[in-house]
Curated annotation (Swiss-Prot):
Induction: Down-regulated under highly reduced cellular thiol pool conditions. Down-regulated by ascorbate. Slightly induced by oxidative stress. The active site is at 119 (cysteine sulfenic acid (-soh) intermediate). This is 2-Cys peroxiredoxin BAS1, chloroplastic. The keyword Nucleus does not apply. The gene is BAS1. Residues 73-232 form the Thioredoxin domain. One of its GO terms (molecular function) is peroxidase activity.
Amino acid sequence: MASVASSTTLISSPSSRVFPAKSSLSSPSVSFLRTLSSPSASASLRSGFARRSSLSSTSRRSFAVKAQADDLPLVGNKAPDFEAEAVFDQEFIKVKLSDYIGKKYVILFFYPLDFTFVCPTEITAFSDRHSEFEKLNTEVLGVSVDSVFSHLAWVQTDRKSGGLGDLNYPLISDVTKSISKSFGVLIHDQGIALRGLFIIDKEGVIQHSTINNLGIGRSVDETMRTLQALQYIQENPDEVCPAGWKPGEKSMKPDPKLSKEYFSAI
């Protein structure tokens, strides 16, 4: 975990965003990447996924899995907490994941490095759609192993020059690599993170995760759709969402007989 000794206080804003107090640091310096290679395999996360999960047995069958290994970043487990420095609105702040519990959903995504190629296309795409995530009571957090100084230099670089421009959410600095490691996305021999993305609900539980190799960008549309489906089934626990489900479309009852209502309509 990336621990910080100083205490934090939340900042109130018109959009009710949960960011801790700003910290003061010196002027930025820039780190540039010249080459980036893809790993042959990532064993750190796969080893934990060998464990099988079990459905809870109640009077009404639950289709929400509770993972058995609490120390792994598995769907159904609590997300590993962290506190770290970040850049937001061209200033330095502290972000603590557990501050969002009981308040917001979180889209937490990892990317390899600043000043690279696929990364700015993803980061700016999430920023451009941030107002849609806000309407779903969701905060977006980006993470890489770069310093806050590198993050700041990148947001101060124009998009047409490969920069980010102003972003609508924080970029977190994981210089110790502890956050990437705790979420199982760290490529140990390269010291950078795979493109991991986690949807964390208001209880701090991981409800969705994807991991892409370095050369494959992620879809904001699919992230949004998955988030909407998650929120729907949490509000309607007697229903499940079929493939490609979008808000307004027909859901399904997870029952051998009642599900026929859905299948007969398609």
